[in-house]
Regions:
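GHKL/Bergerat-fold ATPase module in large chromosome/replication-associated machines
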Residues: 112, 133-153, 174-179, 184-648
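GHKL (Bergerat-fold) ATPase N-terminal catalytic module, capturing the glycine-rich phosphate-binding loop
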Residues: 1-188, 195, 406, 620-648
Length: 648
């Protein structure tokens, strides 16, 4: 005896606890018990074909599931191989020992579904008593009846032989599961679980099996293959109508045997753009109803059904093991989606237009994840803009060869400015828009103007041909700017727009991250990076007031100021009110003064412009009008930023 062997002990098993865990807690839903028992019935037919090929010729194969609501019971009957009494003891009544697994190892058959010897135990998750009446094809004259309450103890007694070999499993349901004894509910559940099983599955007295739907990748359709695929997708899709459908075929290198159908769904939800919906069948039986992780993360609009013999299930048979076959299938699905979108664009242009219109936002992100998709989508996918959805090419043409994109949210100064210029701007705050357009501009060798960035603003607001004299700049700053606003003389289009208020994005960010609650909302690492980025600004300048030196209105205002015209202050007050109103209309703009006071200021200006002329000293009149119209208690420093009061 080797060292330490004398201390070996045998592990004890608490059968009651084990049965309770496996029967009650292994599966996520009691409906899985029905799947497991129908799966066992399917494997019984496969076993019969393997063990008795001559006797199986011409033999009708069927599985029938019936419900008795009054008794609260469900019965699953098959015409398969049946069981002998020794087989009942060795396999049916032994946890973890499956005849199916042994037979697969011996024959190498890929038709058998079972693997763990746990499926029958699931019956006790829904039933307080299970009865199995069976006749084996090996002993067609003998019958046996297995009966158990709870799964820990059982009896096997002789029973009349069944009219033909096969098995009848009867479940006397627990009170909390008696609602399962409803044949309409069984049709719905089994119609999804068993749709790909090759053995017909009937419910009640129905002559039509629940899995009688033609499977387009198995049966060559007589008519249009695409129409057959669309019919299957429409029948199987749970939430959305299919826009197009395309096949999944086995990999040429043999890395995956998966076949099936994928489709583009016509729909989305408000809660998420990720509506991936993939059902995976293992040897014809539903294994994973929500296998979305097999699909690429960018394909939130894809639904599908696939089946494989190579995938490995978990013990609960409700998920897949992440092995080499799983990884190969993920790659194959990505290829199938990309190829399917190409084929749709080429062969079904009407469907392609619907896909672009319905899923343009998601496709922008998809294009960034795959070079082939970017090539396909670059000139077709719609981009959200201030003038509705436009392609990148249309944006470029409308922008005289440049693509304009706003970094702020919609409704800001950028939209107002470019609406006046009749140039559309892309909404860079929308998902994937900015990186998509950056890549488009790079590949198409065109300019991209990012409004709200320093470089974009420099391109938009050009230096004036001649700088304004200091006294004129100071007067304009005092008349037009609020505290925290810096007056910046510039030239920009259209010339009919005299001024525009542009928020300082860095100052806005600095204010947000220095908020007392920022530490609670933002992860510390990201917060440190953001604070390092905004350290270069002190936050005192919250917006820049760009004054259009090409504007005739500005020319007239400055001429009136130079000539001491009494209407200069009135005109300045009117422009100041216009600035406040335009800034208020920009949803992301800064607070630019009191909107109510601005509206009242327009009325004051109109009254002043229409009042009878009264001779006044020009200098006195100008000072009085500014104080009265603008309510100034402060003036601006020499740099154009509003500061403490000083003599003008």
């Amino acid at each position: 005896m080797s060292e330490g062997q004398e201390n070996l002990r045998t592990t004890e098993v608490d059968l009651g606890g084990l049965v309770s865990v496996l029967a009650t807690h292994l599966y996520s839903t009691p409906l899985v018990a029905l799947r497991e028992l129908v799966q066992n019935a399917h494997d019984s037919h496969t076993r019969r074909r393997l063990e008795d090929p001559d006797g199986s010729t011409g033999r009708p194969e069927l599985i029938r599931v019936t419900a008795d609501p009054a008794r609260g019971s469900i019965a699953i009957e098959d015409t398969g191989a049946g069981l002998t009494e020794p087989e009942i003891h060795a396999y049916l009544a032994t946890v973890g020992t499956g005849y199916t697994r042994m037979l697969r190892e011996v024959t190498g058959s890929q038709e058998l579904i079972g693997a763990f010897g746990l499926g029958f135990l699931s019956a006790f998750s829904v039933a307080e008593e299970v009865t199995v009446t069976t006749t084996s094809h090996r002993e067609p004259g003998l019958g046996h009846r297995y009966r158990s309450r709870g799964g820990q103890q059982y009896t096997v007694d002789p029973a009349p032989a069944r009219p033909r070999p096969g098995t009848l499993v009867e479940l006397l349901l627990k009170p909390e599961h008696r609602q399962l004894a409803d044949e309409q509910a069984l049709r719905e559940v089994l119609g999804r679980y068993c749709v790909l099983l090759p053995v017909p599955v009937h419910v009640g007295a129905d002559e039509q099996p629940v899995n009688g739907v033609p499977v387009p990748w198995r049966d060559r359709p007589a008519g249009d293959p695409h129409a057959a695929r669309m019919a299957f997708a429409a029948a199987f899709g749970r939430r959305f109508e299919p826009l197009t459908a395309f096949p999944l075929e086995p990999a040429a290198d043999g890395s995956t045997d998966a076949v099936g159908l994928l489709w583009v769904q016509d729909g989305g939800s408000y809660g998420s753009t990720d509506n991936r919906d993939l059902a995976v069948y293992l040897r014809g039986m539903l294994l994973a109803e929500d296998a979305r992780d097999l699909l690429p993360s960018w394909a939130g609009f894809i639904g599908g059904v696939i089946e494989s013999n190579l995938l490995t299930p978990t013990a609960s048979r409700e998920d897949l093991q992440r092995d080499e076959h799983y990884r190969a299938l993920r790659q194959a699905l990505t290829e199938a989606v990309v190829n399917g979108l190409y084929e749709t664009a080429r062969l079904h242009p009407a469907a392609w237009r619907r896909i672009l219109a319905r899923h343009g936002q998601e496709l922008l992100g998809a294009a960034l994840c795959d070079d082939r998709l970017f090539t396909l989508l670059a000139d077709d996918v719609p981009v959200p803009t201030s003038q509705g959805d436009l392609t990148a090419g249309a944006l470029r043409a409308a922008g005289s060869g440049a693509v304009h994109v706003a970094l702020g949210s919609g409704g800001g100064f950028e939209e107002m400015l470019y609406r006046a210029m009749r140039v559309p701007i892309a909404r860079g705050d929308r998902y994937a828009v900015l990186p998509f357009l950056r890549r488009y501009a790079q590949l198409r060798d065109c300019r991209i103007v990012e409004l709200g960035s320093e470089s974009g603003n420099k391109e938009l607001f050009r230096e004036p041909e001649q700088p304004l004299p200091a006294d004129q700049a100071g007067w304009l700053a005092a008349a037009l700017a609020e505290p925290g606003e810096r007056l910046v003389p510039a030239r920009f289009e259209p010339v009919g727009l005299p001024l525009v208020l542009v928020p300082d994005r860095e100052a806005e960010l600095k204010a947000r991250i220095e908020d007392d609650q920022a530490d609670a909302r933002i992860p510390s690492a990201a917060l440190r990076l953001a604070r390092a980025f905004t350290a270069r600004t002190d936050g005192t300048v919250k917006a820049r007031l760009y004054l259009n030196t090409d504007s005739p209105a500005v020319h007239d205002l400055l001429r009136a100021y130079r000539e001491g015209h009494t209407g200069a202050a009135t005109a300045a007050g009117l422009l100041r009110s216009v600035k406040v109103i335009m800034a208020a209309a920009a949803s992301d703009g800064p607070a630019a003064g009191d909107l109510g006071a601005a509206l009242a200021g327009i009325g004051t200006a109109v009254a002043a412009l229409t009042a009878p002329a009264v001779p006044v000293d020009p200098a006195d009149g100008l000072s009085v009008d500014l104080d009265r119209l603008l309510g100034l208690g402060e003036s601006n420093g020499p740099d154009g930023t509003r500061g403490e009061n000083e003599e003008r």
